[in-house]
Amino acid sequence: MKKLVAQSVIDAFFDGTHSDPFAVLGMHETHNGIEIRVLLPEAHRVIVIDKETHKAVVELELVDERGFFNAIVPKANQFFAYELQVYWGKESQILEDPYRFHPMINELDNWLLAEGSHLRPYEVLGAHFVEYDNVAGVNFRVWAPNAKRVSVVGDFNYWDGRRHPMRFHPASGIWELFLPKVALGQLYKFELIDSNNQLRLKADPYAFAAQLRPDTASQVSALPEIVEMTEKRRAANQSDKPISIYEVHLGSWRRNLENNFWLDYDEIADELIPYVKEMGFTHIELLPISEYPFDGSWGYQPLGLYAPTSRFGTPDGFKRLIEKAHESGINVILDWVPGHFPSDTHGLAAFDGTSLYEYADPKEGYHQDWNTLIYNYGRHEVKNYLSGNALYWVERFGLDGLRVDAVASMIYRDYSRRDGEWVPNQYGGRENLEAIEFLKHTNYVLGTELPGVAAIAEESTSFPGVTLPPEHGGLGFHYKWNMGWMNDTLEYMKLDPVYRQYHHGKMTFAMLYQYSENFVLPLSHDEVVHGKGSLITKMSGDTWQKFANLRAYYGYMWAFPGKKLLFMGNEFAQGREWNYQESLDWFLLDDGQGGGWHSGVQRLVKDLNKTYQNQTALFELDTNPQGFEWLVVDDNQNSVFAFERRSKSGEVIIVVSNFTPVPRDNYRIGVNEPGKYEEILNTDSAYYKGSNLGNYGEVIAEEIENHGKAQSISVMVPPLATVYLRLKK
């Protein structure tokens, strides 16, 4: 038995500490001739087969009983393609030797990844099906620059880290290994010996599929095909188009009635898409679906950033859901969470023994509110990981927009921190300059590669220029959630109407900054959780008043400048607070159980969406001051508001809201134009379970001066109601 490799080297393989397997294993030219070395723990015999002649060339010698084989190939003077016939006791199988293949990452990809400027890093890193030298398999790559050894482990090698150590590329910090015959759906992880000599088992940060919790392995899955953006979908995102967003948590919109289990992506699509279409929403916004370990995070603490959650099926199933939405003319927005990640040991935390993805200093890298870690946006590879992820979801699944979660927590270093708990930037300021640059870069990439995709910011401060283009010094988002409008108006609606006169400005203040950004008016999931109650329970008064208040509020919201967002269940005034573990209370739409109140609100929201889409005055000039004018802004005594909305072509709608339970008959409002004003929507209609007061179809302008206008109209403003009056041309 001739040992051609030093025993210390062999021992290092079986100890799992050898960091350069390709320097030893596979086929090598030596002064003795062509030599083949194989590491196959627990194998008994290994015969080398010439792939061209299919003949046995040499039987390798077992030089270490733990499973290390080598031999000089007789009469061979050049490398050749081979496979191995391996005997495990009496059984044998034909195997490819992963260590006979050359490096597969090309120099350009390696350089771009090292620089952190690869536009689509997910096309290189992770697990990819490839064919090399007529051999099909999966190429695994992972970034772990400070690891001392990395192996691929999975159900194809008994999760044994000794069997498949990877090749290291020092210039980029990437480890690589091509494994023949690995199949779709097989489970895998990366086993690392980290910088501190600790053994770590990590899921693939770039995995396209992952196991459902509590299991944590990545799953081999094909890179989804590119979905081309269409002009119709692109146009639907523009600021001069009607955008009415239905926000959905897939795990609780509907559930299986028999066992309370989740529906899968296809079952959800079959029910959700027709419903959204029928209700008249233009967009669906999905709470995060990147794989996440904790159900109670609702997806806002993701670990598998490239993997659609397996709670509801496969990546293909998710893609079909989006396709069905597009077939029905509905755009899809995804909640995206690039701000932080959980500290689960199988995830990104201390990935290679160092703070690789997160800031090292807890004053920068630990989020005490959520017990999560904050991405190190100053590290080019991390920025590349996240920006690439944004492009991946939009390009590979056909999403029409991304809503970026918790932007304020990203751009401020002192977010939710006291003095002494945060680290200033290089200029001594509180802004996270790296995060700001990351957001600008990501929005620039999306805008350049996929023009028309909507980028929406949930940004809760007055940070300037959120929706300005990056080239003009802005963050580059297309829309920003108007959290100020939401907070102010909900505070107003909670008040007894008697006290609303003292808080009149809460309903009007948003107009002072309306044109500083492009806004979305959000009534989101955040307002119906954590003890806040449902929207209907926030309204003041008895049952009649609560529902009338909500209807009036919706009417006001749909006419106010800004795109609309409504969380699921709010469209029918769900009575209880949202519970992510249960279906919405759809039974309330049965008038026998809901008293007709809930179905009335649902009919109103449907009609609001229809009216909104059909009346250009309500959306075309959302971002232009010419599209809005207060007609009555100071009548705090009666808690009445009136304003005019106008389109590019001069179409006019007068909106009047009364937020007291007292009808305002013959209420005079000055208008800009004479003519007949048709009542096109009244939230007090009996159709919506209102008291059915109104204006008999229309009102006519008279030459009676009011509020500085030569013309005026006399309106019956129902109690706790909003009325839309359209000027007949």
Swiss-Prot record:
GO terms for cellular component: cytosol. GO terms for biological process: glycogen biosynthetic process. The keyword DNA repair does not apply. The active site is at 405 (nucleophile), 458 (proton donor). Its EC number is 2.4.1.18. It catalyses: Transfers a segment of a (1->4)-alpha-D-glucan chain to a primary hydroxy group in a similar glucan chain. Gene3D superfamilies: Glycosidases, Golgi alpha-mannosidase II, Immunoglobulins. It comes from the Bacteria. Pathway: Glycan biosynthesis; glycogen biosynthesis. Pfam families: Alpha-amylase, Alpha-amylase_C, CBM_48, GlgB_N. Keywords: Carbohydrate metabolism, Glycogen biosynthesis, Glycogen metabolism, Glycosyltransferase, Transferase. One of its GO terms (molecular function) is 1,4-alpha-glucan branching enzyme activity. The keyword Transferase applies. Monomer. NCBIfam families: branching_enzym, PRK05402.1, PRK12313.1. Catalyzes the formation of the alpha-1,6-glucosidic linkages in glycogen by scission of a 1,4-alpha-linked oligosaccharide from growing alpha-1,4-glucan chains and the subsequent attachment of the oligosaccharide to the alpha-1,6 position. Belongs to the glycosyl hydrolase 13 family. GlgB subfamily. HAMAP family: GlgB (MF_00685). This is 1,4-alpha-glucan branching enzyme GlgB. It comes from Mannheimia succiniciproducens (strain KCTC 0769BP / MBEL55E).
